[in-house]
């Protein structure tokens, strides 16, 4: 099966100078992929020429006359720029010409345009950015990582339901554990939104383990961590900054003297493994969960190496049937929730259900 993806080539801080080389490199290592490069045709072809890929059969150029800037208001992207590379790329997914869209564009605009073009799954008011973050024994699914800055309690409940369904579908876990990111484990901690969300989660049929703190994110304390997009995005980028700082410190220390440089040569295999594990670029690309089609959000600041990883996220998600599994799990969860007697102010669907086993890294986080 050929995996067909649309690439919003104009999105992000660097546009075609990053997205096109990443696409070229990706198709050269994945013969079953076809990428549709959407954007200003002359700019895309100029980059293809630089990459000596003008005749690459696995790449096609789809013209779009407008660009959603990183600082464009949502209403501009949604109402005025109807021929933007972002909108055209999503339209191709909606029409069935492609199976997923990858964009490094403006997060707010991408969420709004995706909701308008692709629509959300039943019972979901807002999509959320979800990603499988590494822990010592596997992965922790965390959402939202930036799609929704302000959330109501019922939105956090819906994020938990989507995270539950995704982990159940990918890993076959009947009752994935859920944690609510907070400033303390105690029930009395947090703002009113968090407290109310905790009440809804405790009243639901989810396997809610209570509040978790920032230092639990990489411990594997729970299978799914739920937070609003403001907190999630800050936590994610803080982690990336810390990883970069650690790598820089180690490099600096091993460069201090001739002896330390000799030690670095001896420790090179270990250092290379460490560098690979903490390189945040290989974790680029997260699913915009809750839509009827697949959308992968890349960091706007991604370089070509990082953006290639984002393309790989979409490719893996299609190959592993992530959307189909998630939709099936959400549908299976709906009936038990209807009988749970939840507070009328609650919303969404989730209950114990099992899906087909699959390694999360193979579905959303792998690279070959």
UniProtKB/Swiss-Prot annotation:
Gene it is expressed from: plsX
Species this chain originates from: Burkholderia mallei (strain ATCC 23344)
Physiological role: Catalyzes the reversible formation of acyl-phosphate (acyl-PO(4)) from acyl-[acyl-carrier-protein] (acyl-ACP). This enzyme utilizes acyl-ACP as fatty acyl donor, but not acyl-CoA.
Taxonomic lineage of the native organism: Bacteria, Pseudomonadati, Pseudomonadota, Betaproteobacteria, Burkholderiales
Enzyme kind, highest EC tier: transferase
EC number: 2.3.1.274
GO biological process, one term: phospholipid biosynthetic process
Protein name: Phosphate acyltransferase
NCBIfam families (alphabetical): plsX
The UniProt record lists the keyword Lipid metabolism: yes
Compartments, as annotated in UniProt: Cytoplasm
């Amino acid at each position: 099966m050929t995996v067909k993806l649309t690439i919003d080539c104009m999105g992000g801080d660097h546009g075609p100078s990053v997205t096109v080389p990443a696409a070229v490199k990706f198709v050269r290592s994945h013969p079953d992929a076809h990428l549709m490069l959407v954007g200003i045709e002359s700019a895309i072809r100029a980059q293809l020429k630089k990459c000596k890929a003008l005749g690459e059969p696995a790449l096609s150029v789809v013209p779009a006359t407008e660009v959603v800037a990183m600082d464009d208001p949502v209403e501009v992207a949604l109402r005025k720029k109807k021929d933007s590379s972002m909108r055209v790329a999503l339209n191709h997914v909606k029409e069935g010409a492609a199976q997923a869209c990858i964009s490094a564009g403006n997060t707010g605009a991408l969420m709004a345009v995706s909701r308008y073009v692709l629509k959300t799954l039943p019972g979901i008011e807002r999509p959320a950015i979800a990603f499988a973050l590494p822990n010592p024994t596997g992965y922790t699914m965390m959402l939202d990582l930036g799609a929704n800055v302000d959330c109501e309690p019922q939105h956090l409940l819906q994020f938990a339901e989507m995270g539950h369904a995704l982990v159940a579908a990918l890993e076959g876990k009947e009752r994935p554990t859920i944690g609510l990111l907070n400033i303390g484990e105690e029930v009395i901690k947090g703002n009113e939104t968090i407290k109310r969300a905790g009440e809804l989660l405790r009243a639901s049929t989810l396997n809610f383990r209570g509040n978790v703190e920032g230092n639990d994110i990489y411990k594997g304390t729970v299978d799914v961590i739920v937070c609003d997009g403001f907190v999630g995005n800050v936590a994610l980028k803080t982690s990336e900054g810390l990883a970069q700082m650690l790598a820089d410190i180690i490099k600096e220390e091993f460069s201090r003297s001739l002896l330390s440089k000799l030690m670095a040569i001896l420790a090179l295999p270990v250092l290379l493994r460490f560098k690979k594990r903490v390189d945040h670029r290989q974790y680029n690309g997260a699913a915009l969960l809750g839509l009827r089609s697949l959308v992968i959000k890349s960091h706007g600041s991604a370089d070509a190496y990082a953006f290639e990883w984002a393309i790989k996220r979409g490719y893996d998600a299609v190959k592993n049937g992530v959307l189909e599994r998630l939709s099936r799990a959400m549908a299976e969860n709906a009936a038990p929730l209807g009988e749970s007697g939840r507070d009328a102010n609650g919303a969404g669907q989730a209950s114990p259900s099992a899906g087909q086993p699959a390694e999360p890294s193979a579905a959303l986080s792998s690279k070959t």
